[in-house]
């Protein structure tokens, strides 16, 4: 398998060198393109002719010459190997040897396959070389040995007989998105979404909204939004003396903090009244023991 591949590559390089040594004219290029167009329309006819030519040959050492049509002078156009082709093959098909150099396209297709039988992509073939019109002695052909490894030519899918069907009318293959490009695009979209959300944009048109509750304000956490009603509140205390339970009741300002113990609190807002209706009837105001802070409460 490796020797066969090496032979295919060697033959292809020989074709390229022959074309570089003796460039073909623009008329031959136009005829070659027309010939390949006819072959792509009727691939079965070309394969049948190639089978007959390969019946007496040992492999790909000789090109497959097929009559494709007739030129203006009546001689058919052929597909040959170039200037290195012998005149014996032309005489076999009835073509004069003097017209072989003018009518031959000089394009021979060699394909390289791996050990599994799949065509190796990225190998530029001799049939992919495009010759510019009006070539002079100093002009060079596009392609060649230096570009054979970096080519993007699709050699097609090989059939059961080893021929590759090349679609010359297909559009060039476009590069796809990489995974890193997709991740970058998604990350940029999320970043833009958060950036606009911080500015107060709720995306009414796009339908994208990030509802983030505002952080609590520590200064407003301890105070209520509604003002405290001014006045007094009634407090109740239970006293256990070992035999009985005594219930004591008294009043404190509404704005004062509720604490443990019998404490007479003071007004902090300055608007609560000193006495209320219940304070006036309280008989223990003068006899009650008031504790002003927690350490004063006996255990």
Swiss-Prot record:
Q: Name one GO biological process term.
A: symbiont-mediated suppression of host cytoplasmic pattern recognition receptor signaling pathway via inhibition of IRF7 activity
The UniProt entry, under Pfam families, shows: Paramyxo_P_V_N, zf-Paramyx-P
Q: Where is the composition biased (Acidic residues)?
A: 144-160
Q: Region (Disordered) spans which residues?
A: 40-94, 133-168, 204-229
Report the subcellular localization.
Answer: Host cytoplasm
Q: Does the keyword Metal-binding apply?
A: yes
Q: Which UniProt keywords apply?
A: Host cytoplasm, Host-virus interaction, Inhibition of host innate immune response by virus, Inhibition of host interferon signaling pathway by virus, Inhibition of host IRF7 by virus, Inhibition of host MDA5 by virus, Inhibition of host RLR pathway by virus, Inhibition of host STAT2 by virus, Interferon antiviral system evasion, Metal-binding, Viral immunoevasion, Zinc
Question: Which stretches does the entry tag as region Interaction with host STAT1?
Answer: 110-120
Q: What are the Low complexity biased-composition ranges?
A: 133-143
Is Lyase set as a keyword in this record?
Answer: no
Instruction: Locate the coiled-coil region(s) and give their ranges.
Output: none
Question: Which residues does the record give as Zn(2+) 2 binding sites?
Answer: 255, 267, 269, 272
Q: Which domain of life does the UniProt lineage start with?
A: Viruses
Gene Ontology cellular component terms for the protein in this record = host cell cytoplasm
Name where it mostly resides: host cell
Q: Where is this site: Interaction with host STAT2?
A: 240, 246, 248, 250
Question: Which spans are transmembrane here?
Answer: none
Function, in words: Plays an essential role in the inhibition of host immune response. Prevents the establishment of cellular antiviral state by blocking interferon-alpha/beta (IFN-alpha/beta) production and signaling pathway. Interacts with host IFIH1/MDA5 and DHX58/LGP2 to inhibit the transduction pathway involved in the activation of IFN-beta promoter, thus protecting the virus against cell antiviral state. Blocks the type I interferon signaling pathway by interacting with host TYK2 and thereby inhibiting downstream STAT1 and STAT2 phosphorylation.
Subunit annotation: Interacts with host IFIH1/MDA5 and DHX58/LGP2; these interactions are involved in the inhibition of the host type I interferon signaling pathway. Interacts with host TYK2; this interaction inhibits the type I interferon signaling pathway without affecting the type II pathway. Interacts with host IRF7; this interaction inhibits IRF7 translocation to the nucleus. Interacts with host CHUK. Interacts with host RELA/p65; this interaction inhibits the nuclear translocation of NF-KappaB.
Write out the similarity annotation.
Answer: Belongs to the paramyxoviruses V protein family.
| Domain notes for this protein | The N-terminus interacts with host JAK1 and STAT1. The C-terminus interacts with host STAT2. The C-terminus also interacts with host PP1.
Protein name per UniProt: Non-structural protein V
List the source organism: Measles virus (strain Ichinose-B95a) (MeV)
């Amino acid at each position: 398998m490796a020797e066969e591949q090496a032979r295919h590559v060697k033959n292809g390089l020989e074709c390229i060198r022959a074309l570089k040594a003796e460039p073909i004219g623009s008329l031959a290029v136009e005829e070659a393109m027309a010939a390949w167009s006819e072959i792509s329309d009727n691939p079965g006819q070309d394969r049948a002719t190639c089978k007959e030519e390969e019946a007496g040959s040992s492999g790909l050492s000789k090109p497959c010459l097929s009559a494709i049509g007739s030129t203006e002078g009546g001689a058919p156009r052929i597909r040959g190997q170039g200037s290195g082709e012998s005149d014996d093959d032309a005489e076999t098909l009835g073509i004069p040897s003097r017209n072989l150099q003018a009518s031959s396209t000089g394009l021979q297709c060699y394909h390289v396959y791996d050990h599994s039988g799949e065509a190796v992509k990225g190998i530029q073939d001799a049939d992919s070389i495009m010759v510019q019109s009006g070539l002079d002695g100093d002009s060079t052909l596009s392609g060649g040995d230096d570009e054979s490894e970096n080519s993007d030519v699709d050699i097609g899918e090989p059939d059961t007989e080893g021929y590759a069907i090349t679609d010359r009318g297909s559009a060039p293959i476009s590069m796809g998105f990489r995974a890193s490009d997709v991740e970058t695009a998604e990350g940029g979209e999320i970043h833009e979404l958060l950036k606009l959300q911080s500015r107060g944009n709720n995306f009414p048109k796009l339908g994208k909204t990030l509802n983030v509750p505002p952080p609590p304000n520590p200064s407003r956490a301890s105070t209520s939004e509604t003002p405290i009603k001014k006045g007094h509140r009634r407090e109740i205390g239970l006293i256990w003396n070992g035999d009985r339970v005594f219930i004591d009741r008294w009043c404190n300002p509404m704005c004062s903090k509720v604490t443990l113990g019998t404490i007479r609190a003071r007004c902090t807002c300055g608007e609560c009244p000193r006495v209320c209706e219940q304070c006036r009837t309280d008989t223990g105001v003068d006899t009650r023991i008031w504790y002003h802070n927690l350490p004063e409460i006996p255990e």
